[in-house]
C-alpha cells in the first residue's frame, strides 16, 4: 500500500473534453498546439529584430517545420524505441492514436525540413538553425508537461521528499522526471539561449548551444528517468536517450567552437 509520506499523482483526466465518437481533445494534443503557438509567436517577434527574415518567410518555414516534427517524431519513436513492433507489423508506424513521439526523431525531422527549406530559399542551413533554435525549448516544456499530465515517462524509484506515486508506476514513489525535463530542457535552456543571444555570435553558435544544452540536460535527466521497459539500460549502463544525445553534445561543441573562430579577435 502506498505510503502517505510521498505525493500522489494528481488525478488529471488525459482527455480534456470529448467531441464526438472517437474524437477527443487531449491535454497532450493541447500541449502540441501550445508549443507551435509559442514558436509562431516568438518567431514573429524575432522577424522584427532580424532583417534577414520576413514574416512570410518565417510562416513558410513553420509549415515545413510542422511537417518535419510530426513525421520525424513518429518515425523516430517507432524505429528507436519500438522497432520490434514495426518489424512484426509495419502499419504500427501509423498507429498515431496509441500515442508515441520521439524528440530525437522530431529533431531529425525538423533538421531535414530546415535543410530542404534552406536549399529551396538558397539560405545558409546554419543561419536557419540559429533562427529556429530559440523556438524549440518552450515547445519541449509544454510537451513534458503533457507527458506529466498523461502520467507517462515517469522516473526511477526514489525516496526524495517530492517523489510521487504514478498510477502506472507501481507501488513505489518515483522521480517526477517529466518535470525535471520541463525545467531543464524547457525553461532553463530557453533562458540560457536568450542570454547568449545578447551579443553578436558567429553563424551556428546558437544552433550549437541548443544541441549542447539539450544534450547535457537530457543526459542528466536520464539518470532519474525510468528506462523503457523493453530496452532497459544499454552498453556502459546508459539508456537509449543518453546514447542518442551524445552525438548532439559533440556536434554542439563543434558548432560553437567553429562559430567562435568566425568572430574577429580583440
From Swiss-Prot:
Q: Where in the cell is it found?
A: Cell inner membrane
- Any coiled-coil regions, as ranges: none
Protein topology in the membrane: Multi-pass membrane protein
- EC number of the protein: 2.5.1.145
List GO molecular-function terms, semicolon-separated: phosphatidylglycerol-prolipoprotein diacylglyceryl transferase activity
Pathway stated in the Swiss-Prot or TrEMBL entry: Protein modification; lipoprotein biosynthesis (diacylglyceryl transfer)
Q: What is its main location?
A: membrane
Q: Write out the transmembrane intervals.
A: 19-39, 61-81, 91-111, 125-145, 176-196, 204-224, 237-257
- Origin: domain of life: Bacteria
Residues annotated for a 1,2-diacyl-sn-glycero-3-phospho-(1'-sn-glycerol) binding in this entry: 144
A GO-annotated cellular component:
plasma membrane
User: What are the record keywords, sorted?
Assistant: Cell inner membrane, Cell membrane, Membrane, Transferase, Transmembrane, Transmembrane helix
Query: Please, one GO biological process term?
Result: lipoprotein biosynthetic process
What PROSITE patterns does the annotation carry? Answer: LGT
What role does it play? Catalyzes the transfer of the diacylglyceryl group from phosphatidylglycerol to the sulfhydryl group of the N-terminal cysteine of a prolipoprotein, the first step in the formation of mature lipoproteins.
Under NCBIfam families, the record lists: lgt (TIGR00544)
What family is reported? Belongs to the Lgt family.
Which protein are we looking at? Phosphatidylglycerol--prolipoprotein diacylglyceryl transferase
| Protein species of origin | Idiomarina loihiensis (strain ATCC BAA-735 / DSM 15497 / L2-TR)
Amino acid at each position: 500500500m502506498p505510503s502517505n509520506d510521498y505525493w500522489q499523482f494528481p488525478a488529471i483526466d488525459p482527455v480534456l473534453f470529448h467531441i464526438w465518437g472517437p474524437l477527443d481533445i487531449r491535454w497532450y494534443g493541447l500541449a502540441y498546439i501550445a508549443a507551435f503557438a509559442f514558436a509562431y509567436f516568438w518567431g514573429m517577434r524575432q522577424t522584427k529584430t532580424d532583417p534577414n527574415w520576413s514574416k512570410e518567410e518565417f510562416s513558410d518555414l513553420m509549415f515545413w517545420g510542422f511537417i518535419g516534427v510530426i513525421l520525424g517524431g513518429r518515425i523516430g519513436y517507432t524505429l528507436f524505441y519500438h522497432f520490434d513492433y514495426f518489424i512484426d507489423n509495419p502499419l504500427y508506424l501509423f498507429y498515431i492514436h496509441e500515442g508515441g513521439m520521439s524528440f530525437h526523431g522530431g529533431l531529425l525531422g525538423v533538421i531535414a525540413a530546415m535543410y530542404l527549406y534552406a536549399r529551396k530559399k538558397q539560405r545558409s542551413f546554419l543561419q536557419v538553425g540559429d533562427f529556429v533554435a530559440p523556438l524549440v525549448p518552450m515547445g519541449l516544456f509544454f510537451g513534458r508537461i503533457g507527458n506529466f499530465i498523461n502520467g507517462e515517462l515517469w522516473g526511477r524509484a526514489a525516496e526524495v521528499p517530492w517523489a510521487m506515486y504514478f498510477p502506472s508506476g507501481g507501488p513505489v514513489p518515483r522521480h517526477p522526471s517529466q518535470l525535471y525535463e520541463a525545467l531543464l530542457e524547457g525553461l532553463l535552456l530557453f533562458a540560457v539561449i536568450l542570454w547568449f543571444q545578447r551579443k553578436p555570435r558567429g553563424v551556428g553558435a546558437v544552433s550549437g548551444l541548443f544541441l549542447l544544452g539539450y544534450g547535457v540536460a537530457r543526459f542528466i535527466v536520464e539518470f532519474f528517468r525510468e528506462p523503457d521497459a523493453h530496452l532497459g539500460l544499454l552498453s556502459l549502463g546508459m539508456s537509449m536517450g543518453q546514447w542518442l544525445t551524445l552525438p548532439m553534445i559533440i556536434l554542439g561543441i563543434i558548432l560553437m567552437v567553429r562559430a567562435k573562430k568566425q568572430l574577429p579577435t580583440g
